[in-house]
Amino acid sequence: MKVHEHQAKEIFARYGLPVPKGYPAFTVEEAVEAAQQLGKFPVVVKAQIHAGGRGKAGGVKLANNLDEVQKYAAELLGKTLVTFQTGPEGLPVSRIYIEEGTNIDKEFYVAITLDRSKSKLIIMASSEGGMEIEEVAAKNPEAIITEVIDPFLGLRPYQAREIALKLGLPKNLLNKAAGLFVKLYELYMKEDASMVEINPLVLTKEGNIVILDAKVDFDDNALFRHPDIMEMEDPTQESELEVKAKQYNLNYIKLDGNIACMVNGAGLAMATMDTIKLAGGEPANFLDVGGSANAEQIANAFKIILSDPNVKAIFINIFGGILRCDRLAEGIIQASKEVNPHVPIIVRMEGTNVELGKKMLAESGLDLIPADTMWEGAKKAVELASKA
C-alpha cells in the first residue's frame, strides 16, 4: 500500500526524523490557512499523488506570498497530474501539501528496500539526489552506494556511518546522518514497510540535513497489524477496477494492452503475460484469481475484465491444483451467462479434473475457444484481438 508524502512525513516525524514543517490542505482556503500557520515565506505547494516526477510535471510550486499560495492551490486541486510514472491517464489531485521552504545546498538519495537477488534488505544511497534512481543507475551506476543489511543484526551504526562518509557529508554531520539512517531502518522494520525512500535528503545552506521528500510503501499482508496506516489509504489513487478487485479479494493490476488475462498464481500470471508479449500481443491486465477462488469470484473477475473497454480478447490460463478445473468451468459458465461477454474467450486449463472441466465447457453452448498449451492460447488470443 502506498501513502501520500505528507502521511509518510507524519510517520517519519514519529521516529524523530528531520522533516520540514507542513500541513495538508484539501481546499484553497485550507491551503491559505496552512501558509499562514507556517508564518514565513517562501512555502512550497506540493500536489499529493501516488507517483514520482511531480516537479517536472508542474506539481510542485514555490510560493512567495499568500496570493501565490491561493493561485497555485486553485491550479492544482482537482487537476489530473500526468507524470512519467502515472501513465497518460494521470492521477487526480484531491489534496496538496503546504510546506516551509528550505535553502538547499546539496541533494542526496537514500532508500531501504529488498534486494531479491540477495534475499536481504539493502540500504542504497547516492550523492545524485533529486533524480529518479533508475536514471542514476542507467547513467552513472558507480554513484550508487549499497550496503547489505544482516537480517539478524540489522543496520549497524558503522555501516550507516560509512554510507554518510561515502556520500561526502561534512564531518560534523556524519554521526547525525548515520543516526538518521539507523532510524530509517527502525521505521522500515517496525512499520512493516516494503520500501522507504528519501529523495532528496538535503544538506541546507545553514548546515543541517533535512528530508525534503519521503515515500513509504507498506506490505499489504501486514496491514492488519497497522490499523492507523490502513486509514491512510486513498482509493482515488487507484483505478476504479483495482478498487473493485480488492473488494472481491482479487489481485488485479490494469495495463495498457488489449488481451485480458485470467490466471491462478502470480508466477503463472507473469509467464502468461510474457507469452502474450512473445506472441506479438499486449496484456490488458495482471489478474490472479488465487487458489481458493469459487464460481462467484470467477464471475466477479470476468466482470472486472469486461469493464475495461480496451479488452478485445480474454485468455484464461489455469493450472488446476487447489482451484479445480471443474470449479473454474462452473465460474466461466456462470459469468458468461451473467455478463454476456462480447469478446472471444480462449481457455487453456490443465490439472485437477481437467477432463471434467473441458466437458462442462464443451456442453455449455458457449462460444469458447479451447487451447492445449499456453503458447497456442497466447497465439490465438493475439490473432483474435487483432481482428476485433
From Swiss-Prot:
A cellular component annotation (GO) from this entry: succinate-CoA ligase complex
This protein's UniProt keywords: ATP-binding, Ligase, Magnesium, Metal-binding, Nucleotide-binding, Tricarboxylic acid cycle
Catalytic activity line of the entry: succinate + ATP + CoA = succinyl-CoA + ADP + phosphate; GTP + succinate + CoA = succinyl-CoA + GDP + phosphate
Keyword Ligase appears in the UniProt entry: yes
Residues binding substrate: N264, G321, I322, L323
Subunit and interaction comment: Heterotetramer of two alpha and two beta subunits.
Protein name, UniProt field: Succinate--CoA ligase [ADP-forming] subunit beta
